[in-house]
């Protein structure tokens, strides 16, 4: 069976942070590298993308769940995009009536950034999402989630195994049901766990969830493992470890920077 792995390049939410007190779980923002055989797929392009390799066996694809800054921070400094002749496919959730390139140009263009991504030396090709599509041998399925401005939940299936990436989510009843359908029997569910229960109650409408809500979804959909992501920027390693220990489930973990997980 071919390799199907997830490497955590960045799991921090909202903004990048630094310091020894946050080193174990990492300070880089959302970016995950999935290796499915010879196909590489990145989930989001946050600041963690800066540490990604730039040479691959086939054309890599970067899937952006949404265009909030913490999820696209790394694109402008990703070395591969500046290497002439290297192709990178970038999938962007554009608003209705807007093409995918224009959506990114709102940030990656003067005066906010010196170049548009399409002006880099590399061969950067920008595409819109489809609700179901194939990238190499990987089946990609998406659905709109619940987050201010929108955010896609993304399912990757490869050789009979699947992972579901559902960052930045605060689902109501209807959206929760559709997420449960998307993640049914997934081998790995990656879900927003930024808030504590108390914070989730105080910050309704912010578009994030607590671990208890993620666990409830895991149990509802029958996912085998849960990886909690999008850590609050102020949360320290000690606080995250304490939360993980309080949960006390072997199949539930908070994402750790640099970790590689076999799907």
Positions of predicted regions on the chain:
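Binuclear metal-dependent hydrolase catalytic cores
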Residues: 1-164, 174, 179-180, 240-263
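Active-site flanking residues adjacent to catalytic metal/cofactor-binding acidic residues
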Residues: 43, 65, 167, 191-193, ...
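Glycine- and other small-residue-rich loops at beta-strand/loop junctions that grip anionic moieties
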Residues: 93, 143, 168, 203, ...
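Cap/insert and terminal regions of metallo-dependent hydrolase folds
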Residues: 171-258
